[in-house]
Amino acid sequence: MRIDIITCLPKLLDSFFGHSILKRAQEKGIAEVVVHDLRTYTLFKHKQVDDYSYGGSAGMVLMVEPIDRCITALKAEREYDAVIYMTPDGKTFDQQTANRFSLYKNIIILCGHYKGVDERARQAFITHEISIGDYVLSGGELAAAVVSDALIRLIPGVLSDETSALTDSFQDSLLAPAVYTRPADYKGMIVPEILLSGNEKEIEKWRFENALERTKERRPDLYQKFTKAYDADGK
């Protein structure tokens, strides 16, 4: 997978992709993340990429021309499966979306900034508008990093234990169950006995029931979604 991130603040992303799983994925050649400075695609002398909004509303707007020039240049080199715009008014990013996007070969992510981007850029180039939550950040860089991380870790060969990603929270619309490691008894706080039994069938049953209870308690919206799907399947 190749992810091209377009931003007017590239240094914000310098360190994020240089560590841990994301770094190893790139070293293995499994994933490639390329950050593009939008300012290199402007024709203005002082590298301006934003301007005042027509109509006089507050806040600056990213101009369509440098976005056009950057995306057009990238598309001249390869085909892209998706051009994603990170924006608070986009569709909320979830695990199912991550699963789907992780199958793509090439992706462009455009980071919003200031008051957003010229609507004409959205209409002409964007295939998916994505939000990571109902709140506003200073720019789309952190959101782009979140999406990139979620996609890359799903690619086969990235995680040392590939089953780990399949048992994460939200993969089956449930939160992940509680997990424990050594020691079995820490200051009187004891690991559930069933997890030490070696009985895989009973352990799996405990994990499902624990995940179900945690989801019901912490995310009733997900619990309701799961039970509806569960009932619809006749289980």
UniProtKB/Swiss-Prot annotation:
Membrane keyword on record: no
Catalytic activity, reaction form? guanosine(37) in tRNA + S-adenosyl-L-methionine = N(1)-methylguanosine(37) in tRNA + S-adenosyl-L-homocysteine + H(+)
InterPro entries for this protein: Alpha/beta_knot_MTases (IPR029028), tRNA_m1G_MeTrfase_C_sf (IPR023148), tRNA_m1G_MeTrfase_TrmD (IPR002649), tRNA_m1G_MTases_N (IPR029026), tRNA_MeTrfase_TRMD/TRM10 (IPR016009)
Q: Briefly, what is this protein's role?
A: Specifically methylates guanosine-37 in various tRNAs.
Q: What cellular component terms from Gene Ontology apply here? A: cytosol
Self-association or partners: how does it assemble? Homodimer.
Location in the cell: Cytoplasm
| Keywords from the UniProt entry | Cytoplasm, Methyltransferase, S-adenosyl-L-methionine, Transferase, tRNA processing
> What is the organism lineage in this UniProt record?
Bacteria, Pseudomonadati, Bacteroidota, Cytophagia, Cytophagales
Write the protein's name: tRNA (guanine-N(1)-)-methyltransferase
| Enzyme Commission numbers on file | 2.1.1.228
Source species, please? Cytophaga hutchinsonii (strain ATCC 33406 / DSM 1761 / CIP 103989 / NBRC 15051 / NCIMB 9469 / D465)
